[in-house]
Amino acid sequence: MSGKPAARQGDMTQYGGSIVQGSAGVRIGAPTGVACSVCPGGVTSGHPVNPLLGAKVLPGETDIALPGPLPFILSRTYSSYRTKTPAPVGSLGPGWKMPADIRLQLRDNTLILSDNGGRSLYFEHLFPGEDGYSRSESLWLVRGGVAKLDEGHRLAALWQALPEELRLSPHRYLATNSPQGPWWLLGWCERVPEADEVLPAPLPPYRVLTGLVDRFGRTQTFHREAAGEFSGEITGVTDGAWRHFRLVLTTQAQRAEEARQQAISGGTEPSAFPDTLPGYTEYGRDNGIRLSAVWLTHDPEYPENLPAAPLVRYGWTPRGELAVVYDRSGKQVRSFTYDDKYRGRMVAHRHTGRPEIRYRYDSDGRVTEQLNPAGLSYTYQYEKDRITITDSLDRREVLHTQGEAGLKRVVKKEHADGSVTQSQFDAVGRLRAQTDAAGRTTEYSPDVVTGLITRITTPDGRASAFYYNHHNQLTSATGPDGLELRREYDELGRLIQETAPDGDITRYRYDNPHSDLPCATEDATGSRKTMTWSRYGQLLSFTDCSGYVTRYDHDRFGQMTAVHREEGLSQYRAYDSRGQLIAVKDTQGHETRYEYNIAGDLTAVIAPDGSRNGTQYDAWGKAVRTTQGGLTRSMEYDAAGRVIRLTSENGSHTTFRYDVLDRLIQETGFDGRTQRYHHDLTGKLIRSEDEGLVTHWHYDEADRLTHRTVKGETAERWQYDERGWLTDISHISEGHRVAVHYRYDEKGRLTGERQTVHHPQTEALLWQHETRHAYNAQGLANRCIPDSLPAVEWLTYGSGYLAGMKLGDTPLVEYTRDRLHRETLRSFGRYELTTAYTPAGQLQSQHLNSLLSDRDYTWNDNGELIRISSPRQTRSYSYSTTGRLTGVHTTAANLDIRIPYATDPAGNRLPDPELHPDSTLSMWPDNRIARDAHYLYRYDRHGRLTEKTDLIPEGVIRTDDERTHRYHYDSQHRLVHYTRTQYEEPLVESRYLYDPLGRRVAKRVWRRERDLTGWMSLSRKPQVTWYGWDGDRLTTIQNDRTRIQTIYQPGSFTPLIRVETATGELAKTQRRSLADALQQSGGEDGGSVVFPPVLVQMLDRLESEILADRVSEESRRWLASCGLTVEQMQNQMDPVYTPARKIHLYHCDHRGLPLALISKEGTTEWCAEYDEWGNLLNEENPHQLQQLIRLPGQQYDEESGLYYNRHRYYDPLQGRYITQDPIGLKGGWNFYQYPLNPVTNTDPLGLEVFPRPFPLPIPWPKSPAQQQADDNAAKALTKWWNDTASQRIFDSLILNNPGLALDITMIASRGNVADTGITDRVNDIINDRFWSDGKKPDRCDVLQELIDCGDISAKDAKSTQKAWNCRHSRQSNDKKR
């Protein structure tokens, strides 16, 4: 089989006539272009060996790569594999290849293409203008001789990019692996004929690479010598940017003479260095010519500034083998050793500064052993269709193969843990399916011709589809959720438009027909950004949507040397001769320097003030010790390179253990806390143990988490819709069912998040909070509808830069920005905040039209904030060499005080040495602070603070009046119960509820008070506070008196607007939805009716349209089909009440800590002062406003004195958390630590450093006429629903609203609605039984009981059972089937 077009021009027909038109897309015959072996860089092991070939391989090491179109990239590839039809040895010696070594051998009926991996690809003979396509290698080989290819050919456009003389020459061959190119030109070297030869000289029986041509007609040319000792060899290259490189070649005799001269000049005995080499090796014929160096000899951009040294140099063994490589700085970077017996067979290699890796071979030339003196070693055992790999940890992997030569594939893999994975391939070696260790299969559908994946089907049956144009470019991709990515291209194959799955469109513009670099882009907002490029494809300037320009400078090697931004900001970078970054300097001249070892590892960072941070590495370049400011951390690794031990600054250890597949199975922390992990066959975590606390993790077929059990009880549950989007998460918190519900639009964007809390016994809804999001036509999330508030709309310009904010229709905040889009002025009524920046871009000042609140900032050379000055006081900060805050010096009119902060090496707070000079405490090895100047602390085995007791100073008589704080946690280490006692009597008690995401949703506090008998005891009724969230930001706090809602600055945890509404006012806003109103009064005799969920959704949509005064035509047509009008429906809606609200602006410091609340009149109605750790120092609150926000992400709890910080609780007195970090080491080595420089750093999530009772609704009274209208509307809608069930899926309303989730089951049931009479009877029984025995029966069980007793006929209950999706009905149907 040839792989040629099914019908080719020139083929003869049965009756003798030739075919004049052929099909370029359909191919016939046996595969052509099949390689002699698999790709050397395909399946590899260790450092690296290809076990399928048994070959030592180095897939690619790049020595030269300057930027530009069609750049000259000199990369080396090594393989000890030996093909039976080798090309001659190249200029890098036996076993080595570079891209220029591609060669085509012309034989009688076969073409043999030798690639740069040392392989041979076999093609059938080609006639002029004919092509062969290797489906296994996705490679075309085309013979010249025609001006045009068939119009339907995938390479037709690329063919026309070639010069006409190349296209028309039948003696030239061209190869490419993409319809976008480039072409590899295979020609011959024009040599000078000998004197006795007949002219012209005959063409050789091979073709060599003479150049490249891309689809824009740009060329790279390889210059080969026409005569002399280097005839036919490449001695020069001109790249696509017209840079010229000179390749210095040497013969074996020249190298031998050079070796002798070096020995003589060095006074040593010359080593044996023969003048000639054998003419043949296992890797092909060898002429002994080698590449010695490569020079850059012409650079159009830097004609007078050429490098004074070669870009790369090579050294050679006496046998002509590549021995060493020197980079452009002259430093040796690589060395190689070869077998004494077999020339070119590599037995060892090393990177400079790294250990030497050695190899052993069997008699067939296959690698049997890989020896690593500082890591894993491997042995290889070869059998028929089976390779066994065993490492030095005695872990074994077995590869089972099928196929031969280039079609050899691994079809089964036995892993070290005994698990097995399998793969299936088609006839040309393309992957068709993979079966994981659990037996689940993922299927792949490659295009028959191109091999491009057109479909992926996962084990759960969900599929992704991919579509391509005729040039093999992706035009569309549809995910399992049905969302689609689309791309469009111009005639040159350049991307001109991309439509993201969410509908955002990005467009690309080009002004140069010979370049693939865009000159402009246009985003979904319509904002246009322009770019200019150098001839080498480097970005020179970027102009944003406002016309502001950023400029870039580069050196001759393509490295960025400077960035110049608007407002005078610049950054400069310097590099050493090896191209390593050695210095970065800002506009003010502050310079950070970098140092490296011989292997290129970064060993030191020197700050502008000269302080030094150092890192030491092991033999393989893994950091083993870091030192900063005299403090050291160290890391240890096993032979597999896995971290096995960490040693903190305190000398404490954390240790790790792994399974045979390198998965973490045990972690023992600095404090001895041990956590264990168990994985299933596919690597998913299925069980975790935390000091006896056992958690099981459960997944569905799509590997999505479905539920978790802790100590045998169900914890969280996750639910997904048919598109795979998360819709609900629920769990039980302190007996309450707490859930989070999500809604999306048809583009997959989040449109709503609702938190609900239900009563433990009655399941009554206690709390509900919803935040909705809306997107403008450009896709920006510019509208947020907080719970019970008007919409918050963010006003933007350009690509989304913030310009202002509105609440409902009322503009509240305006912003002015500079040429870097930084805020310079913020206006809120009469309030104006002016912000200025230093030349280095740091915050310089924030000035108000109220002078007392002005703040000026001073920074040191290291970028640390060292002073904040205001009219009232000045605070100066001092830091350790590690960047930790060590002291605050505050000066004011009548104040001069310095507060020191002392920590142990790991960052744990220590007693102040000035106040406690007798303290001998120097560190807390386990990071658990057991005592300080005021308290004693106790922890449980999970590292959670469980008790804090007043410290009785020595010498003080104990009176048992110390206060004790006790903390209790749930299985997720969340604080759920707090008590404070004195004299063994409770002073305060609180309990906390959380949603499944760990966000606190409720707080109940009991305080000590005097009862009717005069005794002091805890109150019987708690003070209840509810919390509502928008993502990770706490937006709502509500108690029995007031609701406070916070609007944050977009993308931050800095509060912007505070809205307070009295609970009494809030109650007046409670109204039924249109659907509820119709259901409650739409039944027979004024009773209620139950609408199907889809109808409720449609009514909700209609109601939102009516409230926004934007009723769609689809909704109007739907109402008309029901015999209703918009006006009628509007009359059924409860009126909307607008409550009285207090609105304030938060005036915050540079971190986001509120300093003042400003009214719209510009008056300060609350202000406060804090220390650097967030402790309140003083407060002015004449209006009795409740302001509980502290440092970003923190909420003050009065009962405990702690700050709730999203994932944990923060103790401001200690400046640290009371529990360990949920994300472990990712958040830092000290699991309790808050940022040790709180002056500028924050932790709003309680995870890691950022370098910053609900009242029941009151029904609105209605007139009898309105009540009658409600009844009629409800009946009309119910009738419409039942009458149109069979056609509803095709209804224009649904078709035009793809985001509306249809209940297909309900549609199929054709109007199975629960009988209201039966429903009422069931509910009565449930309520009676609940109150009598405390257990709530299932409604399906009650209904079946009524049927069994004969109280209700099965026929009458059938509709209700179906509507409830009752399991008894399902079981009955199953029996019938």
UniProtKB/Swiss-Prot annotation:
Sequence repeats mapped onto the chain: 330-352, 353-374, 375-417, 418-438, 439-460, 461-481, 482-502, 503-525, 526-546, 547-567, 568-588, 589-609, 610-629, 630-650, 651-671, 672-691, 692-711, 712-734, 735-758, 808-828, 829-850, 851-871, 872-894, 895-930, 931-959, 960-984, 985-1019, 1162-1186
Region (Disordered): 1356-1377
Keyword presence, Repeat: yes
Domain of life: Bacteria
Keywords: Repeat
Annotated Gene3D superfamilies: 3.90.930.1, RHS repeat-associated core
Annotated spans, 28 X approximate tandem repeats: 330-1186
Pfam families, per the entry: DUF6531, Ntox34, RHS, RHS_repeat
Function in brief: Rhs elements have a nonessential function. They may play an important role in the natural ecology of the cell.
Comment, domains: Each rhs appears to consist of a highly conserved 141 kDa amino fragment followed by a highly divergent C-terminus.
Similarity annotation: Belongs to the RHS family.
Record protein name field: Protein RhsA
Taxonomic source organism: Escherichia coli (strain K12)
Native organism taxonomy: Bacteria, Pseudomonadati, Pseudomonadota, Gammaproteobacteria, Enterobacterales
Gene: rhsA
